[in-house]
């Protein structure tokens, strides 16, 4: 027996967001950060370094290494995608741009899979709104489409999605395959086979992207929930659903075993002190904003469906995906990259809060969003004006302090793009307060629009500054002014991203220094490893020419030494 639904939605409220508007939302969010920037510290640049080495044939595709160092993240599939794109784009695309293209597709896949997952869950009978006595309630397909629109907007609105989703790391691949597996689990058992294919590819891709344990738990939990959610779970059709989920999960486990992907990364209780729980709490609050307040509201309003003997999949399934990834964030490092995988499920649960919101709560969301993102956009513009003109003086001095040698430049196309985006934000605010008050996705328009606006402004107006402070290009250029890339140069103690930066920005073919092999006239050293070098080699053989520092990081120095004696 279905529990009473808290959703009361008229047909007028189930109007869909125009497809062109939804597509523009997605493009305005996904494209900025794709073009016009260098690889950034640290995971983004390190991953790119491995992809570049693989594409150039300098390392094995099955065991990639940078000067003998394996990637910190397990799972080779993202590296294969990036390296293949670099090789295919050789001669007509810059390597950094080519490497980003498959990850741009993966971000689009995550968005599309989330929309379809919400749509399929909203089509389930337990998720449907109350039927009116004299008709006029929302039609199932229209209601599901409106809820899916709200779910996708909620995903775009999440603050934590912006930077991590625009990197070329395993995290983006894990996000896409988690969303794909979520879509498959939500729609499995329908007449078409697309959800089954999505589940197989999602769980397998998630395992091959370095998250085999999460993949196994998601698959096993989805199977259990499908059994619990069925009144008569042992019918022929339900056996088929259970078998497909079990097969997909088993395939992911076998792939993980064959690729030797199982690693113990759980922090045991005695290691709990290594995690700053206050930092984790702050991360949860801002990273998942504005989804988490809506998730709490949704779980309360749909509590009867959650705690029923036969739980409703439209809430229970995303709740399971959310719990698995939240536990991973709390028990592994880094927490933000594991928490990224929770966002599609959180956006789904948040979407089911939309038809239950009161006017006062919806108004609170709108006003807070309006003030927050308008303020953020204004700050971005003010700092940009300060970079261009020197006024306001406080803003200009802050930039000068963070990036002492940065010289701002004016670009008319960039200015026009930022101006148009700001005007569109003003139009969205006018639209929201003036019309279409009935649409159930209306409360997510300003959060998603504000997130897209601020990300676009950062990736346009602030891009030169961000490139200056977040890439290693300045350090490499300073080294190139002293040591030509064609000369023999070795390194001691450099990180993965630093080695990748020298290869990409300077074209250096750096070799690893060893205690009995300090044969090059030039040596690049991490200051923290200098003591070890002095033990292994005679310090009198080397002259320190320069200590070079990234502008925004006092603890990220590189020392350039030249041999003074044979």
Task: State what each model feature region is.
Residues 135-154, 462:
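Intrinsically disordered, low-complexity acidic Ser/Thr-rich regulatory segments
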Residues 76, 80, 89-117, 141-149, ...:
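Loop-to-helix entry region of an early transmembrane alpha helix in multi-pass inner-membrane enzymes
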Residues 47-73, 77, 84-87:
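Extracytosolic helix-loop segments that constitute the early lumenal/periplasmic catalytic or substrate-binding loops
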